[in-house]
């Protein structure tokens, strides 16, 4: 039987503010599935943890891990995996963690006049791509990552999140 392309995804609700978004977990699972299928990543045997937190929680993470003492919308923490064969072929490998901040995400969605679920899909796809090695440190990397995000989101019925700003040249 072929392996599922979607990693096992555990969604952890770490802040009560997420309680008014009962569909958040389904949105996250759909976004990760769409991203994994599009990039044809071999992640079906992997695990991801997605923590739904608040601005205070993500500010602490951002400060501790990046030295930036302010909240942000999403953080990704790729797991460091050995490049050789694993010792236990039956044990799932950890792909990494994603943290998403409710208040920052809500504010951005409101400011950009986009549905909350669309913005959650975008941040989930963005975080997943970081876990599998994509980045946006250079203009070329950003252009590649944004184009991939836009393509994945289109399959989910989410409009291009970058349409209202100039593309990088």
Curated annotation (Swiss-Prot):
Gene name of this polypeptide: ybeY
EC number(s) reported in the record: 3.1.-.-
Protein name according to UniProt: Endoribonuclease YbeY
SUPFAM superfamilies recorded: Metalloproteases ('zincins'), catalytic domain
Function: Single strand-specific metallo-endoribonuclease involved in late-stage 70S ribosome quality control and in maturation of the 3' terminus of the 16S rRNA.
Similarity field: Belongs to the endoribonuclease YbeY family.
Keyword set includes ATP-binding: no
Main localisation: cytoplasm
